Amino acid sequence: MIEADRIISASPKREEEVIDRAIRPKLLADYVGQPSVREQMEIFIKAAKLRDEALDHLLIFGPPGLGKTTLANIVANEMGVNIRTTSGPVLEKAGDLAAMLTNLEPYDVLFIDEIHRLSPAIEEVLYPAMEDYQLDIMIGEGPAARSIKLDLPPFTLVGATTRAGSLTSPLRDRFGIVQRLEFYSVDDLTSIVKRSADCLNLNLSPDGAYEVARRSRGTPRIANRLLRRVRDYADVRNNGVITSDIAKQALAMLDVDSEGFDFMDIKLLQAIVERFDGGPVGLDNLAAAIGEERDTIEDVLEPYLIQQGFLQRTPRGRIATSRTYAHLGIAKLD
């Protein structure tokens, strides 16, 4: 199964973009969670405005779905400037980047998502732009080619990535501010779900919000997606009223359990416990047992299970923890 097809996938879905923009917080005052990031950014933005300067270049990293794009837009809104948005894979030629840079107004924000996927040629153009607000471009071809420098207005580059370790050192070192986004607590996600429900004019009880939040794997994007599907269920089965019981019924219908696991997570855990006596089991054997690719298990299924303490990676293989046995309702043999 493709990761993006799972309802608990943190990957963005194109059809969700319009609604996501409508419920996305616009200012730091509306931004829930990430208290350290919020406090730091409030100070940095106020200081830049007091000095009438562009905000330092900002790198935001962390798992998908935690609000990197949201934070980039908040920075632009708080600074009172425009934001231009692109992504690493889209910037194929130096001219593409040059066109964006030369159209910036003073203090504008240039947001590059998936910045770890920039080509080396694009990075070379970025270095002087970030450091000196200058653009080095080549005019002409062959022996007649010459380099000219163009002055750029002061601007803020905001880069977002799920793989900070994949950035080259020269690029990473040019960011004056680096922020890591962490998974959200259930309390913070409950607040996010309530806010989204208000934006969408939903009839949502506090207990209903909690049931959605606790299954959202620490990720606002998943929380908002589950809320929309629960809304569909409530519209058909309960006149649009989302109670705790309605939320539980809707999420059970979607095969999302109390831990936010779907059938793929459960299939993996059951295989380790029931077919391999809890492990250790090698990755190849596990992949064959559940009919999934090695990469899918390693990159998609395992990270959240490990982070929540349901699975251990060891040199000898994967091992199910006591939490797995308790969750599956299976007695652990000594």
Curated annotation (Swiss-Prot):
<feature type="binding site">
    <location>
        <begin position="131"/>
        <end position="133"/>
    </location>
    <ligand>
        <name>ATP</name>
    </ligand>
</feature>
<dbReference type="GO" id="GO:0006281">
    <property type="term" value="P:DNA repair"/>
</dbReference>
<comment type="subunit">
    <text>Homohexamer. Forms an RuvA(8)-RuvB(12)-Holliday junction (HJ) complex. HJ DNA is sandwiched between 2 RuvA tetramers; dsDNA enters through RuvA and exits via RuvB. An RuvB hexamer assembles on each DNA strand where it exits the tetramer. Each RuvB hexamer is contacted by two RuvA subunits (via domain III) on 2 adjacent RuvB subunits; this complex drives branch migration. In the full resolvosome a probable DNA-RuvA(4)-RuvB(12)-RuvC(2) complex forms which resolves the HJ.</text>
</comment>
<dbReference type="InterPro" id="IPR008823">
    <property type="entry name" value="RuvB_C"/>
</dbReference>
<feature type="binding site">
    <location>
        <position position="23"/>
    </location>
    <ligand>
        <name>ATP</name>
    </ligand>
</feature>
<feature type="region of interest" description="Small ATPAse domain (RuvB-S)">
    <location>
        <begin position="185"/>
        <end position="255"/>
    </location>
</feature>
<keyword id="KW-0963">Cytoplasm</keyword>
<dbReference type="InterPro" id="IPR036388">
    <property type="entry name" value="WH-like_DNA-bd_sf"/>
</dbReference>
<feature type="binding site">
    <location>
        <position position="318"/>
    </location>
    <ligand>
        <name>DNA</name>
    </ligand>
</feature>
<feature type="binding site">
    <location>
        <position position="69"/>
    </location>
    <ligand>
        <name>ATP</name>
    </ligand>
</feature>
<dbReference type="Pfam" id="PF05496">
    <property type="entry name" value="RuvB_N"/>
</dbReference>
<keyword id="KW-0234">DNA repair</keyword>
<dbReference type="GO" id="GO:0005524">
    <property type="term" value="F:ATP binding"/>
</dbReference>
<dbReference type="GO" id="GO:0000400">
    <property type="term" value="F:four-way junction DNA binding"/>
</dbReference>
<feature type="region of interest" description="Large ATPase domain (RuvB-L)">
    <location>
        <begin position="4"/>
        <end position="184"/>
    </location>
</feature>
<dbReference type="GO" id="GO:0005737">
    <property type="term" value="C:cytoplasm"/>
</dbReference>
<comment type="similarity">
    <text>Belongs to the RuvB family.</text>
</comment>
<keyword id="KW-0227">DNA damage</keyword>
<feature type="region of interest" description="Head domain (RuvB-H)">
    <location>
        <begin position="258"/>
        <end position="334"/>
    </location>
</feature>
<dbReference type="InterPro" id="IPR003593">
    <property type="entry name" value="AAA+_ATPase"/>
</dbReference>
<keyword id="KW-0067">ATP-binding</keyword>
<protein>
    <recommendedName>
        <fullName>Holliday junction branch migration complex subunit RuvB</fullName>
        <ecNumber>3.6.4.-</ecNumber>
    </recommendedName>
</protein>
<keyword id="KW-0378">Hydrolase</keyword>
<dbReference type="GO" id="GO:0016887">
    <property type="term" value="F:ATP hydrolysis activity"/>
</dbReference>
<feature type="binding site">
    <location>
        <position position="24"/>
    </location>
    <ligand>
        <name>ATP</name>
    </ligand>
</feature>
<feature type="binding site">
    <location>
        <position position="174"/>
    </location>
    <ligand>
        <name>ATP</name>
    </ligand>
</feature>
<keyword id="KW-0238">DNA-binding</keyword>
<feature type="binding site">
    <location>
        <position position="313"/>
    </location>
    <ligand>
        <name>DNA</name>
    </ligand>
</feature>
<feature type="binding site">
    <location>
        <position position="184"/>
    </location>
    <ligand>
        <name>ATP</name>
    </ligand>
</feature>
<dbReference type="InterPro" id="IPR027417">
    <property type="entry name" value="P-loop_NTPase"/>
</dbReference>
<feature type="binding site">
    <location>
        <position position="221"/>
    </location>
    <ligand>
        <name>ATP</name>
    </ligand>
</feature>
<comment type="function">
    <text>The RuvA-RuvB-RuvC complex processes Holliday junction (HJ) DNA during genetic recombination and DNA repair, while the RuvA-RuvB complex plays an important role in the rescue of blocked DNA replication forks via replication fork reversal (RFR). RuvA specifically binds to HJ cruciform DNA, conferring on it an open structure. The RuvB hexamer acts as an ATP-dependent pump, pulling dsDNA into and through the RuvAB complex. RuvB forms 2 homohexamers on either side of HJ DNA bound by 1 or 2 RuvA tetramers; 4 subunits per hexamer contact DNA at a time.</text>
</comment>
<feature type="binding site">
    <location>
        <position position="294"/>
    </location>
    <ligand>
        <name>DNA</name>
    </ligand>
</feature>
<feature type="binding site">
    <location>
        <position position="65"/>
    </location>
    <ligand>
        <name>ATP</name>
    </ligand>
</feature>
<dbReference type="InterPro" id="IPR004605">
    <property type="entry name" value="DNA_helicase_Holl-junc_RuvB"/>
</dbReference>
<keyword id="KW-0233">DNA recombination</keyword>
<dbReference type="InterPro" id="IPR041445">
    <property type="entry name" value="AAA_lid_4"/>
</dbReference>
<feature type="binding site">
    <location>
        <position position="70"/>
    </location>
    <ligand>
        <name>ATP</name>
    </ligand>
</feature>
<feature type="binding site">
    <location>
        <position position="68"/>
    </location>
    <ligand>
        <name>ATP</name>
    </ligand>
</feature>
<feature type="binding site">
    <location>
        <position position="69"/>
    </location>
    <ligand>
        <name>Mg(2+)</name>
    </ligand>
</feature>
<dbReference type="InterPro" id="IPR036390">
    <property type="entry name" value="WH_DNA-bd_sf"/>
</dbReference>
<dbReference type="GO" id="GO:0048476">
    <property type="term" value="C:Holliday junction resolvase complex"/>
</dbReference>
